[in-house]
A protein has these predicted regions:
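Flexible "cap/lid" loop of the alpha/beta hydrolase fold
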Residues: 105, 109-158, 167
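Glycine-rich His-Gly loop
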Residues: 22-26, 93-94, 119
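Gly/Ala-rich beta-loop-alpha elbow adjacent to hydrolase catalytic centers
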Residues: 91-96, 100
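Active-site loop/oxyanion-hole signature of alpha/beta-hydrolase fold enzymes
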Residues: 46-48, 52-89, 102-110, 126-137
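Conserved alpha/beta-hydrolase catalytic His-Asp/Glu region
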Residues: 156-192
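Eukaryotic N-terminal low-complexity, Ser/Thr- and Lys/Arg-rich leader segments
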Residues: 1-19, 65, 81-84, 141-156
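Conserved HGGG/HGGXW glycine-rich cap/lid loop of the alpha/beta-hydrolase fold
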Residues: 12-60, 77-81, 85-86
């Protein structure tokens, strides 16, 4: 009886199951979603957490990502590969708002909803470059601790081309409220 009831509940959950596509923010990777992936899968949903170009375990190194299109390519390829009649729920965190916005424009028929989790929402008066420039103007160098910034590679305007969060910055600014083991898990995942 219990097995039959469990099967019926699972079947009902599978009928209502959604496909979530999780997009990380700057300097992170698919790994940062590990707790949410487990919760969503436990609830019967399909989950895809992607590493964007030069992030996480993606095969490209950060210096090989020379444009926003290099960065978002894994997301675009994934969305291009799903069946035309399938719709996903896109979830972007922080700078992940930009890739999901681009995906919404390129694949509107494949996206049921997009969720911006404290994420960048593009606007024509505030392109990403302006947002980053304003952040750097208003932020003291000391508060950035051991972050690394690369400027001017492959662009004549000497714009910011890459950011790498340092371990001190992550411990003090990103994971200060987490258990020590959670921040320890992130360190090997940050690319240099």
């Amino acid at each position: 009886m219990f097995a039959l009831l469990s099967h019926k509940l699972l079947s009902r959950n599978m009928q209502n199951a959604k496909h979530f596509v999780l997009v990380h923010g700057s300097c992170l990777g698919a790994w940062c979603w590990y707790k949410l992936v487990a919760l969503l899968r436990h609830a019967g949903h399909r989950v895809t957490a992607l590493d964007l170009g030069g992030s996480g375990i993606h095969s490209n190194q950060i210096h090989e990502v020379t444009s926003i299109w290099d960065y978002v390519q894994p997301l675009m390829e994934f969305l291009g590969s799903i069946p035309e009649d399938e719709k996903v729920i896109l979830v972007g965190h922080s700078y992940g708002g930009l890739p999901i916005s681009l995906a919404m424009e390129m694949f509107p028929q494949k996206i049921s909803v997009a969720v911006f989790v404290t994420a960048y929402l593009p606007h024509y008066t505030f392109p990403p470059g302006v947002l980053i420039q304003e952040f750097l103007k208003r932020t003291s160098a000391e508060s950035l601790l051991d972050c690394q910034f690369t400027f001017g590679q492959n662009n004549p305007e000497n714009q910011l081309t890459s950011v790498l969060f340092g371990s001190q910055y992550m411990a003090a600014k990103l994971y200060q409220h987490c258990k020590p083991e959670a921040s320890f898990l992130t360190l090997p995942q940050i690319k240099s």
